[in-house]
């Protein structure tokens, strides 16, 4: 017998609805609730916390006493102003709100190269998440490659859980990283954090101006070929954890018609978007790290709850954290040589098996979708979209509901 799916129309109207239960969403919900607002929080994970806070570090008991949490739920459409359509495992729900805070976070940027679709080649954060969920990595040979501080955090975690981390391949130049490190002198907390990462990685090779050019194996990954200073070599490994920075998850804000900036969703001083009563906070406005996400979430929470003076007290802290985020972006920006990674027969869209040669025959996203089905598979362009924006300069196509894959029955509104 198939599982039954119930349709529910919520009679409650929340003052503030927060989408996303990562650091920015948690901070927003906390400040809105303490300001007296009736708050709902929606997240597609089983527990709040996002990719940063999990398990015992998540303040779940407090949240559930102050905020109505809809875990394991995801927004797939906005059928009318002030209404969200949610899908859960066995039910659909319409949630009503007066103000909306979108803290949808970011995802890893993947760049295609020969062999990147082999089993055991995965995102750096993805491998860490799987390890947290029980994937056995003890004794496994792992190469961590890509760009940014996330590589260090992932390598430290994997090593701490028994993995044999062979090396970290950072595509940024040592000079750029050195300049970034000098800037940490003005931020003692960040400097201490960086020192702790390095201490946890003693004995692991950290190679700058280095990146993977091919993953090799028959049925699964067996080795990765790396390039540095014009030389190449092959490193045997069981896993390749690869990530070239992060991409803001702007699909839901785009569905609402929010204006975009060069870095993400455009917001004003109070984190309000171009659409009235809709706010954005955290990585969705631009990649900035944990501290910036927290303060942006607090500002959005206060503002959405009608406390602009409290929000204004946090502007200085946000400015400082934005300066750090800008330095981070400049230091670890993907180099131009990475555009040469995919070969003609390299799959760019792994969902629909579309090669780079076929995609290059098109001039934009819409044409590629029509002629090759690129971006029309289960991930809806979330993997190939970021890659093609970097490789070919294509901007994301317009967003239409459902924002995420949804059951056919979910698309029929209740009642």
Language-model features: where?
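Beta1/beta-strand and adjacent pyrophosphate-binding region of the FAD-binding site
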Residues: 11-24, 140-145
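Glycine-rich dinucleotide-binding loop and its adjacent helix/turn
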Residues: 106-143, 147-154, 262-269
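A conserved FAD-binding loop/helix module that cradles the flavin
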Residues: 281-316
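Glycine-rich FAD pyrophosphate-binding loop
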Residues: 34-51, 166-175
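FAD-site-proximal beta/loop scaffold in flavoenzymes
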Residues: 122-131, 239-288
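Active-site-proximal substrate-binding core of FAD-dependent oxidoreductases
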Residues: 272, 302-341
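A Rossmann-like FAD-binding core segment of flavoenzymes
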Residues: 62-88, 95, 161-251, 261
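N-terminal Rossmann-like FAD-binding beta1-loop-alpha1 element of flavoenzymes
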Residues: 16-38, 154-158
């Amino acid at each position: 017998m198939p599982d039954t799916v119930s349709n529910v129309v919520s009679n409650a109207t929340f003052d503030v609805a927060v989408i996303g239960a990562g650091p920015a969403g948690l901070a927003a919900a906390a400040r809105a609730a303490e300001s007296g607002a009736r708050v709902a929080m929606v997240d597609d994970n089983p527990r709040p916390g996002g990719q940063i806070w999990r398990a015992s570090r998540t303040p779940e008991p407090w949240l559930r006493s102050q905020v109505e949490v809809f875990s394991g739920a995801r927004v797939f459409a906005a059928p009318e102003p002030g209404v969200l359509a949610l899908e859960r495992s066995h039910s659909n729900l319409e949630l009503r709100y007066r103000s909306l805070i979108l803290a949808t976070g970011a995802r890893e940027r993947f760049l295609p190269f020969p062999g990147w679709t082999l089993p055991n080649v995965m995102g750096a954060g993805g491998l860490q998440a799987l390890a947290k969920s029980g994937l056995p990595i003890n004794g496994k040979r792992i190469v961590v490659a890509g760009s940014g501080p996330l590589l260090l955090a992932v390598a430290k975690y994997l090593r701490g859980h028994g993995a044999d981390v062979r090396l970290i391949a950072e595509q940024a130049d040592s000079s750029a990283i050195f300049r970034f490190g000098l800037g940490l002198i003005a931020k003692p907390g960040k400097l201490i954090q960086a020192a702790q990462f390095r201490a946890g990685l003693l004995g692991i090779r950290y190679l700058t101006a280095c990146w993977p050019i091919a993953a090799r194996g028959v049925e699964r990954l067996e080795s990765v070929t790396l390039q540095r200073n014009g030389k190449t070599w092959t490193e045997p490994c069981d896993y390749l954890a690869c990530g070239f920075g992060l991409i803001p998850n702007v699909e839901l804000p785009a569905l609402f018609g929010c204006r975009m900036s060069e870095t993400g969703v455009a917001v004003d001083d109070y984190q309000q978007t171009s659409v009235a009563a809709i706010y954005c906070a955290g990585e969705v406005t631009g990649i900035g790290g944990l501290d910036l996400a927290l303060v942006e979430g607090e500002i959005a929470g206060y503002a959405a709850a009608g406390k602009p003076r409290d929000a204004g007290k946090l502007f200085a802290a946000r400015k400082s954290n934005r300066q750090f985020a800008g330095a981070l972006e400049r230091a670890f920006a993907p180099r131009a040589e990475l555009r040469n990674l995919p070969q003609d027969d390299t799959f760019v869209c792994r969902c629909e098996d579309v090669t780079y040669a076929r995609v290059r025959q098109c001039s934009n996203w819409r044409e590629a979708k029509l002629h090759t089905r690129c971006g029309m598979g289960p991930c809806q362009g979330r993997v190939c979209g970021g890659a093609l924006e970097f490789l070919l300069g294509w901007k994301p196509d317009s967003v239409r509901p459902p924002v995420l894959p949804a059951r056919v029955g979910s698309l029929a509104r209740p009642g």
